[in-house]
Amino acid sequence: MFTLKIFVYTTVIFFVSLFFFGFLSNDPSRNPNRKDLE
């Protein structure tokens, strides 16, 4: 149960940080030339 909780927290933090930094560095509205992530 403890391992599952650690896995869930790690996954959530990973995706949140990935989305957060991705949104800051590659904002579609500020960088219309970037078509890597729609």
Swiss-Prot record:
GO cellular component, one term: chloroplast thylakoid membrane
InterPro entries cross-referenced by the UniProt entry: PSII_PsbI, PSII_PsbI_sf
Swiss-Prot/TrEMBL GO biological process terms: photosynthesis
Lipid bilayer topology: Single-pass membrane protein
Membrane spanning stretches: 4-24
Places the protein is found: Plastid, Chloroplast thylakoid membrane
Similarity annotation: Belongs to the PsbI family.
Annotated HAMAP family: PSII_PsbI (MF_01316)
Gene that encodes the chain: psbI
Main location: plastid
Entries under Pfam families matching the protein: PsbI (PF02532)
UniProt name for this protein: Photosystem II reaction center protein I
Source organism phylogeny: Eukaryota, Rhodophyta, Florideophyceae, Rhodymeniophycidae, Gracilariales
Annotated function: One of the components of the core complex of photosystem II (PSII), required for its stability and/or assembly. PSII is a light-driven water:plastoquinone oxidoreductase that uses light energy to abstract electrons from H(2)O, generating O(2) and a proton gradient subsequently used for ATP formation. It consists of a core antenna complex that captures photons, and an electron transfer chain that converts photonic excitation into a charge separation.
